[in-house]
């Protein structure tokens, strides 16, 4: 079901120890070339948690991962719709991948050896989201 006013997306930073998973989409995802974090629009009435599980399974073949919602972004996108982006961290049990039909490439990168921002879709937005959440994950929790 298309909506001309809202865009609801689940966006997943998949981390395994010091590596992050990036994908390239074969269908001109968002009309953008380059690396993405696995993501997709939510289906009608789909909960963001269920969307994250679906995306991991359908896009990269990951069925066993711990998921954590870390941020909800809100902004007006290039298509003038209100975007709500549900950013998740995913911690799969293994690094084994199986790409789905919309994914042309999936690759694990060491966090400190990620492609340049220019090699990411949307002017490096996925890289900035990934680094923000990956670095926050590595920081010890504040004590009270």
What role is predicted for each listed range?
Residues 62-71:
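A short coil-to-beta-strand element that immediately follows conserved catalytic motifs
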Residues 73-97:
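Active-site-adjacent beta-strand/loop module that shapes the phosphate/pyrophosphate-binding cleft
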Residues 29-34, 101-144:
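Nudix hydrolase/Nudix homology domain
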Residues 16-58:
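Conserved Nudix-box catalytic region and its N-terminal flanking loop in Nudix hydrolases
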Residues 1-21, 41, 72:
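Conserved N-terminal beta-strand and adjoining loop/helix that marks the start
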